[in-house]
Amino acid sequence: MARIVLWRHGQTDWNTVNRFQGHTDIPLNSVGLFQAQHAARELAALKPTAIIASDLLRTQQTAQALSELLNLPVQLDPRLRETHGGSWEGRTGDENRKEDGENFTRWLTGGDIPAGRTGESRSQVAARAVAAINEALLVQHETVVFVTHGGTSRCILGELLDLPVEKWGILGGLANASWSILETHQNHISGKWLLVEHNAGTIPEPQMGDFDGDVNA
């Protein structure tokens, strides 16, 4: 059996104002650091064999909390980064609705279009992130924690559960420092994945669970 944990990073200051982070390298705030430590104590009970994180600071800081408990190194993979948001990065949801309303609304409601016109589509994010997971599972066959982002985790879930991209929005977004768990008893590349937990964790400062949750990922 292979088991993967998709763990979203803790809160940042940009999360609190719904500002699109994307590839912008924003650190955790004090709440986010607390969330990471709190969640790490629960995730340690799963006895993961590897921790693999996006190379952005907010995910590295989150992963470090679990690394210190388990004495496991954090492996970095930029393919686990958040969606590149193009012109939307650094702007709030309200600003993007005002300045690029038609495209932003289409993207929020599930359109598989480039974020911020020059950024990534959801299918592009899923392709790179799932490739990273598949490669990791070639050498790690037990429980692997992937520390990633709200938008990216939704794309991974949609792809692994074989949902059409326009339906990925039915998967509520992960709150900061919360996680989802998937398992397969088959080949991890060609087999079926089962979602056994979603948005798990008892973490303060919950975030939005609809497509708007991608904005402050």
Task: List each language-model region with its residue ranges.
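Acidic, low-complexity terminal tails and accessory targeting/binding regions
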Residues: 2, 83-95, 158-217
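Generic beta-sheet signal
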Residues: 4, 142-148
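Short glycine-enriched, charge-decorated loop/helix-capping segments at active-site entrances
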Residues: 19-27, 91-93, 112, 212
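Loop-to-helix element that buttresses phosphate recognition and phosphoryl-transfer chemistry
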Residues: 4-5, 11-66, 116-130
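Phosphate-coordination/substrate-recognition cap region in phosphate-metabolizing enzymes
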Residues: 39-105
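Short glycine/proline- and acidic residue-enriched helix-loop micro-motifs
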Residues: 102-124
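General small-molecule cofactor/ligand-binding pocket signal
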Residues: 5, 75-77, 196
